Amino acid sequence: AQMRQSSLYGSELSIRGIEVLAQNMTCPGNDDIEMLQRYEYDKSDVQSWAEYIWTSMYANISNANSVLSADLVKQAKDFPYTTYKGEALALRAFMHFDLVRLFTPQYTTTQPQTTGIPYQTEFSLKTPDFESLQKNYDHILADLLEAERLLKVQPIHDYDASTAFMNDRQSHLNLYAVWGTLARVYQTMGEKEKAVAYADSVITKSPYRLKEKTEVVGDLAGVLSEKETLFGIYYADFYSTVSELLQKRTFYQSLDPRSDFMLYYERESLPLDYRTSAYFTQIEAGGQYFYRLSKFTDIYELNNIAGSRPSQLILGINLLRLPEMYYIMAECLLETDPVRARACYNEVRTHRGLSALPEESALTQDLLDLEFFKEYFGEGQQFFRYKRLNQPIPSHDAKTTYPASSKIYVLPIPNSEYANRY
């Protein structure tokens, strides 16, 4: 599947468009970017951008369905068919879920019978009908739960030359990534107990562990985090995209972080938040210094020493990481088990070099929001978080806010989707 293409997770749903919608990134003078950050969904250029995402995602969903329809695979000698099928089902659910998050109202703030999207379950030229938002989620959960049943516990870093498909499990939607996706979906649906159960399974039953604070630098720099990535996409050329959009400031599409981003990080307090220097650097351009989001810049490519990169590192894009599981638990337990919620919150903080929240201090939604912002800046998740919580979005220049509404949170479904039905 070409999930790494620029219209999807190679750019628009990771570091570019979706981060512009979150007001995390901006590009002064670029009309396309400025229309996006003003949520001008009636403009043809923005509608074309949304259609770009829509059609690309469904093309990839079709690829997953092609795998699921390939009966010959079942007869292949020594081929791990149940794993293959489980991953394809999980990918189908993962991609539909992101389309739902983009193109439909938030589940918890609308009626279940609100119109959703077409859920494509067959490899066919026939376009499936639109269905209700409730049915969308029913389909997503059905695919994920069947994937959970099919997938077996797999080592993450084992290499077996006889079955290459089973290598590099982080770049596959493995069992632990299915659990993580289920936690994400259930939280979006407001099903807190189920979200906690799956997030806890990832934390307690998977081999993933939070990296130490001294490991933060470079851990996401064009590679999948060895310790924290539940699922990511292999993408050998991600550096060229990151270099043009994030590292440089000479390209007409180059993105600047929001004006006040550093105020979110506790730079002036001790102990130090290790993410600050790991995620951002300053460059000089025209006699001025500018911050760049260097979180994903491959330091081996940047320094022309790609041959020195440790062989076990997987080049690519991180789509689901372990800290989110702690944040899901902390938020979902905030009212019912505040002690456990604080413990989850503190676990990530201390692994990023910060002090734990004292027992006498109450953990609040605002503190959780702040911590999520700092951890996931640039990773394409902040817009979805604002939407799920029905929060206003502070503008990139910190001068105003955009009130929460479907006008900003629901992208326009392409007109071509209605025109091509038969």
Can you name each region flagged by the protein language model?
Residues 61-64, 68, 137, 144, ...:
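Inward-facing hydrophobic residues that define packing positions of alpha-helical scaffold repeats
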Residues 137, 192, 338-339:
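TPR-repeat structural position
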